[in-house]
Amino acid sequence: MQLEFHQVDAFSSRPFSGNPAVVYRLDAWLADELMQMIATEHNLSETAFVVREGEAWRIRWFTPSVEVALCGHATLAAAHVLFEVYDEPGERLEFISRSGALRVNREDERLVLDFPAQYPSEVGSTVELEQALGLPPVDVLGSTDKLLVLLESEEAVRACRPDFAALARLPWRGVIVTARGLQKDFVSRFFAPAMGVDEDPVTGSAHCSLIPYWAQRLNKLSLTAQQCSARGGELWCRLEGERVSIAGHAVLVASGRIRLS
């Protein structure tokens, strides 16, 4: 048995930047264990599987080690594949996920994610967190299963060299570091060694928390963002009450088949 897959660089308009994700469009669900093994084989930060349900698509995301409840860049990648490879009609796709209903609109050359806003709240720093990051935070907030850590500058975000083993021992599945940007409204990086991903190149789901945080801090609803990982990526963001819009480009870089037997 063979399955067709497509690899997309999300939040980028050119190959070999942004965040890569593999997408499988399935006729029916595979066993959870098999989907996890496939994701482990690809060894990217996320592999997405989609199955049609009525007029919508149910979507699931797997890192190399675990299934996750929400992933932005792999949803963007899935929408790109459905539109560009499988010729889905219209300008809007509906996804059903563990995090609820998600929508992706095609607007000119960008895809726009409509995701739930996740408003962070103060939790305070700890010695363990500061030792893991290797520098003192300005502020620390919690949002669902992630920490949002404000640093003093974009330079500090770019220079951050965390101890990934120490981060993985914290009671959080991921850590966002962020600061006011020099060219963009804000910059960030995202570390998730507890999920098998030391650093995620561009993280749409992290912006569910970053957008409401920076919208309030900067007193503006529309924001530009850069995730300053080695691959990097640009995002155009907007706070819409209890929802956020996250826009970006995507490019197909590879297609192939995986043998299951």
Curated annotation (Swiss-Prot):
<dbReference type="GO" id="GO:0009058">
    <property type="term" value="P:biosynthetic process"/>
</dbReference>
<dbReference type="GO" id="GO:0005737">
    <property type="term" value="C:cytoplasm"/>
</dbReference>
<keyword id="KW-0413">Isomerase</keyword>
<feature type="active site">
    <location>
        <position position="46"/>
    </location>
</feature>
<comment type="similarity">
    <text>Belongs to the PhzF family.</text>
</comment>
<dbReference type="Pfam" id="PF02567">
    <property type="entry name" value="PhzC-PhzF"/>
</dbReference>
<dbReference type="GO" id="GO:0016853">
    <property type="term" value="F:isomerase activity"/>
</dbReference>
<protein>
    <recommendedName>
        <fullName>Uncharacterized isomerase PA3578</fullName>
        <ecNumber>5.1.-.-</ecNumber>
    </recommendedName>
</protein>
<dbReference type="InterPro" id="IPR003719">
    <property type="entry name" value="Phenazine_PhzF-like"/>
</dbReference>
